[in-house]
Amino acid sequence: MKVATALSVLAVAGSALASALPSAANSEKRQSDCIGPLLCCGSLTTPLDPLVDPILELVGIDAAAIVGSVGLLCHAYDDTCTSEPQCCTEANLLGGTLGLGCGPLEHGH
């Protein structure tokens, strides 16, 4: 019984990871979809990253429900940013320090 439960949990986690990882086809966002300003993020990771998942859990967020990347150490996008601007569509927490559902803007917008 425990093996079946463990396999079920792994199957659900695997499918959640696959759906949480952005694909090239749907990771681009329109600026009108963004919550808050465009962000310059220190790094982007999957919501199920072993370092990020416990943090999300502490603030009551189900990592498996996030569509897109998690932006870490973000701030409002400006001329000093060396990466492309990120549009976060699910949450912009702590002044952008943690952005949920992040991805690049559609080209041409």
Swiss-Prot record:
CDD domains: hydrophobin_I. GO terms for molecular function: structural constituent of cell wall. It comes from the Eukaryota. InterPro entries: Hydrophobin (IPR001338). It is found in: Secreted; Spore wall. Induction: Highly expressed after post induction of asexual development with a decrease after a peak at 6 h post induction. Expressed in vegetative hyphae. GO terms for cellular component: extracellular region; fungal-type cell wall. It holds the Pfam family Hydrophobin. Keywords: Conidiation, Disulfide bond, Secreted, Signal, Sporulation. Disulfide bonds join C34-C87, C40-C81, C41-C74, C88-C102. Residues 1-20 form the signal peptide. Its main location: secreted. Belongs to the fungal hydrophobin family. Self-assembles to form functional amyloid fibrils called rodlets. Self-assembly into fibrillar rodlets occurs spontaneously at hydrophobic:hydrophilic interfaces and the rodlets further associate laterally to form amphipathic monolayers. Aerial growth, conidiation, and dispersal of filamentous fungi in the environment rely upon a capability of their secreting small amphipathic proteins called hydrophobins (HPBs) with low sequence identity. Class I can self-assemble into an outermost layer of rodlet bundles on aerial cell surfaces, conferring cellular hydrophobicity that supports fungal growth, development and dispersal; whereas Class II form highly ordered films at water-air interfaces through intermolecular interactions but contribute nothing to the rodlet structure. This is Class I hydrophobin dewE. It comes from Emericella nidulans (strain FGSC A4 / ATCC 38163 / CBS 112.46 / NRRL 194 / M139).
